[in-house]
């Protein structure tokens, strides 16, 4: 009888996983670079790039930081995943997996701590908002962010309109010469749907009125309470978004690790 020849299939790198990871990270890389470019452009417009000390001069949060940090992280991850998959570089793929895993566990830890220490988080949020209320006129991006939050959640200040007493332009002291004295920003005002033109002076002198009278002109609920209410009302949607992000991260880690295993198996047969 003629001898039987056995054919062994040599291990190979899966093309589907490789190019899916490559394509996914190309998009991630481009988006990260776009975010980073927007952040740097915004800093350039505000003169921050020519005066780095301006970063620490602002008393509140500079929203541009969000673009720079998120864009930077996305760019680094996208670069590592994209080049790692294309060049079959196990170091970059492992870096991608570890970095993504670290972000995942930080998100998980933050979520657990936020649930366990709810009261502490609420106090820190109050403090954070009030620090930004103080710096309201210091930075146009911060001002726009606060106005957006107050309009979106129909709120005013961290706990209420009187938090605006912390701002030098809106406080009620006799030494305050500002026309905005004892007022609030226009974003606190109850908007009339019939009004076509925004009245930016609607909050002037409003805190001189009694609290019951104020309710007809401005939102009297604090943004911390309104944010908590919004979270409760949209809990399923918010949880779904975070679950989707978490699953995407886990999928990316598994895909990268699978690709690393394939590459090692191929190299072992050289």
From Swiss-Prot:
<dbReference type="GO" id="GO:0051043">
    <property type="term" value="P:regulation of membrane protein ectodomain proteolysis"/>
</dbReference>
<feature type="topological domain" description="Cytoplasmic">
    <location>
        <begin position="85"/>
        <end position="94"/>
    </location>
</feature>
<dbReference type="GO" id="GO:0019899">
    <property type="term" value="F:enzyme binding"/>
</dbReference>
<feature type="glycosylation site" description="N-linked (GlcNAc...) asparagine">
    <location>
        <position position="51"/>
    </location>
</feature>
<dbReference type="GO" id="GO:0005886">
    <property type="term" value="C:plasma membrane"/>
</dbReference>
<feature type="topological domain" description="Cytoplasmic">
    <location>
        <begin position="256"/>
        <end position="270"/>
    </location>
</feature>
<keyword id="KW-1003">Cell membrane</keyword>
<comment type="similarity">
    <text>Belongs to the tetraspanin (TM4SF) family.</text>
</comment>
<feature type="glycosylation site" description="N-linked (GlcNAc...) asparagine">
    <location>
        <position position="171"/>
    </location>
</feature>
<keyword id="KW-0472">Membrane</keyword>
<protein>
    <recommendedName>
        <fullName>Tetraspanin-17</fullName>
    </recommendedName>
</protein>
<feature type="transmembrane region" description="Helical">
    <location>
        <begin position="235"/>
        <end position="255"/>
    </location>
</feature>
<feature type="disulfide bond">
    <location>
        <begin position="172"/>
        <end position="182"/>
    </location>
</feature>
<feature type="transmembrane region" description="Helical">
    <location>
        <begin position="64"/>
        <end position="84"/>
    </location>
</feature>
<feature type="topological domain" description="Extracellular">
    <location>
        <begin position="41"/>
        <end position="63"/>
    </location>
</feature>
<feature type="disulfide bond">
    <location>
        <begin position="189"/>
        <end position="202"/>
    </location>
</feature>
<keyword id="KW-1133">Transmembrane helix</keyword>
<keyword id="KW-1015">Disulfide bond</keyword>
<comment type="subunit">
    <text>Interacts with ADAM10; the interaction influences ADAM10 substrate specificity, endocytosis and turnover.</text>
</comment>
<feature type="topological domain" description="Cytoplasmic">
    <location>
        <begin position="1"/>
        <end position="19"/>
    </location>
</feature>
<feature type="transmembrane region" description="Helical">
    <location>
        <begin position="95"/>
        <end position="115"/>
    </location>
</feature>
<feature type="topological domain" description="Extracellular">
    <location>
        <begin position="116"/>
        <end position="234"/>
    </location>
</feature>
<comment type="function">
    <text>Part of TspanC8 subgroup, composed of 6 members that interact with the transmembrane metalloprotease ADAM10. This interaction is required for ADAM10 exit from the endoplasmic reticulum and for enzymatic maturation and trafficking to the cell surface as well as substrate specificity. Different TspanC8/ADAM10 complexes have distinct substrates. Seems to regulate VE-cadherin expression in endothelial cells probably through interaction with ADAM10, promoting leukocyte transmigration.</text>
</comment>
<dbReference type="InterPro" id="IPR018499">
    <property type="entry name" value="Tetraspanin/Peripherin"/>
</dbReference>
<feature type="transmembrane region" description="Helical">
    <location>
        <begin position="20"/>
        <end position="40"/>
    </location>
</feature>
<dbReference type="GO" id="GO:0072594">
    <property type="term" value="P:establishment of protein localization to organelle"/>
</dbReference>
<dbReference type="Pfam" id="PF00335">
    <property type="entry name" value="Tetraspanin"/>
</dbReference>
<dbReference type="InterPro" id="IPR000301">
    <property type="entry name" value="Tetraspanin_animals"/>
</dbReference>
<feature type="disulfide bond">
    <location>
        <begin position="155"/>
        <end position="223"/>
    </location>
</feature>
<keyword id="KW-0325">Glycoprotein</keyword>
<keyword id="KW-0812">Transmembrane</keyword>
<dbReference type="InterPro" id="IPR018503">
    <property type="entry name" value="Tetraspanin_CS"/>
</dbReference>
<dbReference type="InterPro" id="IPR008952">
    <property type="entry name" value="Tetraspanin_EC2_sf"/>
</dbReference>
<feature type="disulfide bond">
    <location>
        <begin position="156"/>
        <end position="188"/>
    </location>
</feature>
């Amino acid at each position: 009888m003629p001898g039987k020849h056995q054919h062994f299939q040599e291990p190979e790198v899966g093309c589907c996983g490789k190019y899916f990871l490559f394509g996914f990270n190309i998009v991630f890389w481009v988006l990260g670079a776009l975010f980073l470019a927007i952040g740097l452009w915004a800093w350039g417009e505000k003169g921050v790039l020519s005066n780095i000390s301006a970063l620490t001069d602002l008393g509140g949060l500079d929203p541009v930081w969000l673009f720079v940090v998120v864009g930077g992280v996305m760019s680094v991850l996208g670069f590592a995943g994209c080049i790692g998959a294309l060049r079959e570089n196990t170091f970059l793929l492992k870096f991608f997996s570890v970095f993504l895993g670290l972000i995942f566990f930080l998100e998980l830890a933050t979520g657990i701590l936020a649930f366990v220490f709810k009261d502490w988080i609420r106090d820190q949020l109050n403090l954070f908002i009030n620090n930004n209320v103080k710096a309201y006129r210091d930075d146009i991006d911060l001002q726009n962010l606060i106005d957006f939050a107050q309009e979106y959640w129909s709120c005013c200040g961290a706990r209420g309109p009187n938090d605006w007493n912390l701002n030098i332009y809106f406080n009620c002291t006799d030494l305050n010469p500002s026309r905005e004295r004892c007022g609030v920003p226009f974003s606190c005002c109850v908007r009339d749907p019939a009004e076509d033109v925004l009245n930016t002076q609607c909050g002037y002198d409003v805190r001189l009125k009694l609290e019951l009278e104020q309710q007809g002109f401005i939102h009297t609920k604090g943004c911390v309470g309104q944010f908590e209410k919004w979270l409760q009302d949209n809990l399923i949607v918010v949880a779904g978004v975070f679950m989707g992000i978490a699953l995407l991260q886990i999928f990316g880690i598994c895909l990268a690790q699978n690709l690393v295993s394939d590459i090692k198996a191929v190299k072992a047969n050289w």
